[in-house]
Structure formats: C-alpha cells, structure tokens
Amino acid sequence: MGAPYDFAPERPDHIQQILDGLDRYNPETTGVFQDYVMQQCESQTYDCYANLALLKLYQFNPHLSRDETVTNILVKALTMFPSPDFALGLSLLPSHLLAPLNSSAHNPAAGDAPLSEAVQKLNELRNLLEGADYATFWSTLDSDDLYADLIADVSGFEELMRVRIAATVSQAVREVDRSILESWLNLEGSDFEHFVGSVCGWTIEGAKIKVPMNKDNEAKGTVVRENVKFDQFARVIKRAYEQPA
C-alpha cells in the first residue's frame, strides 16, 4: 500500500501543525509556507500537500501571491513527473494565467516576464514530458533564457528530471539505442556512461543500453475470465427482441 497523498517524510513539525489545524487557512501563515517552498528548492525535498495549501491561500488572498513562489511550486511539481502534481497546481491558479498570450505583443526581457507567460512556458514543458518527447523537452528548455530563470532556484533540476525520465523509460523498455537514450537524457560521453551505469544501474553493450527486468517492463500474457450465468445471458437475448414502449 502506497503512502498517503498528504505524506512528506521531510516535513518540519511546525508545518505539520499548520496543516493539521485551522491555521492552514490563516493568511498570516503565507510567509511560513513561502519560506518552506524555498527550503524545498534548496534541499531537493518536496511537499506537494503544503505547496497546494499555499496556492489555496493565494486563491483566497491574491494580494499575498508571489510570482516567484508560484513558479517555484510548479517547477518542483515538474520534478515529480509523471505524477499529477503539476496539474493540481494549475487548477488552483487564476484562469487568466492559463490563457494563451500573443507572443508578438509579449516579448519582455527574461527577468520581467509576466507570470502568465512563465506558467505557460512551464506548461509547455509538462506537455512535452507527458507526450514522452524528451529530446524536445531538453531543446525547449535550452531555447529561452526565461527557462533558465524559472529553474534557477530549484537545486539539481536537470539531474532530477533525468532521474524521472530514466524511471519512466525503465517502466516501458528493456533495451534502447544509445543515441536515442542520449537525446532523452541530454547527456553524452562519460557523463552519459556514468549516469546510466552508476545512477540507473543499466548496462551498456555497444550501441545498446540494457535495462534490467522489473515488474513494469516484463512482458507477460494476461488471461481474463468472465463468468456469466445462463439466466443473465437469457435476459440479454430477451431484451433484444422486446418491442420498445
């Protein structure tokens, strides 16, 4: 049985107390939650439940919202791909932030980009990940200085994304071409070999990468049996011949 959705092993006691009581709806706790988001970014920890509680506070108190904190929450949610955390975060944002912008009319410097543009940029990355278009994910990430600004606060973002992509790949295949996996992980040479061998525990055999068998990538036949009683089948036949009222 998996851990509860609101569980976070690294959650501090004072955050747990806020989440367990009515103070989670108290605007005065906004600053505490914001500091906790920054702590997660720096320490490579993650607490979806607390982050969603902060976004809910922003919903009720939009004047307290901080753009940087919102984007940091979404970037942290990306590092948990393929979980639905990013979509949950989007659902708590104002609808106008999700409306497409006219790129010709909105082309500010990276540091001055509006929150709506930042949210849509991150959503584009999410869509690429969900579509398993990992090579385009990396090229898109490198295509705009705004992306560099958005992920700057999240320590180890690229490494975290490689781990998540590798985990997803291991659920689907047992062998993959080296060139393809290099594009998926955005790594080459010794860096690629170290990640594949030491981090993933996979084997490099020439131009192929071997992924160990696991419960997800093992090919197994499935037999499904359905027991239908004769009287149930008879009722279906009878209804087929009944005249409509």
From Swiss-Prot:
GO terms under biological process: formation of cytoplasmic translation initiation complex; regulation of translational initiation
Domain of life of the native organism: Eukaryota
Domain PCI, residue spans: 46-227
InterPro entries with a match to the protein in the record: ARM-type_fold, CSN8_PSD8_EIF3K, eIF3k, PCI_dom, Transl_init_fac_sub12_N_euk, WH-like_DNA-bd_sf, WH_DNA-bd_sf
Localization in the cell: Cytoplasm
Any one cellular-component term (Gene Ontology): eukaryotic 43S preinitiation complex
Signal peptide: none
Keywords for the protein's UniProt record, in alphabetical order: Cytoplasm, Initiation factor, Protein biosynthesis
Molecular function, one GO term: ribosome binding
UniProt function note: Component of the eukaryotic translation initiation factor 3 (eIF-3) complex, which is involved in protein synthesis of a specialized repertoire of mRNAs and, together with other initiation factors, stimulates binding of mRNA and methionyl-tRNAi to the 40S ribosome. The eIF-3 complex specifically targets and initiates translation of a subset of mRNAs involved in cell proliferation.
Family statement drawn from the similarity comment of this UniProt entry: Belongs to the eIF-3 subunit K family.
Oligomer status and interactors: Component of the eukaryotic translation initiation factor 3 (eIF-3) complex.
Official protein name in the record: Eukaryotic translation initiation factor 3 subunit K
Source species: Phaeosphaeria nodorum (strain SN15 / ATCC MYA-4574 / FGSC 10173)
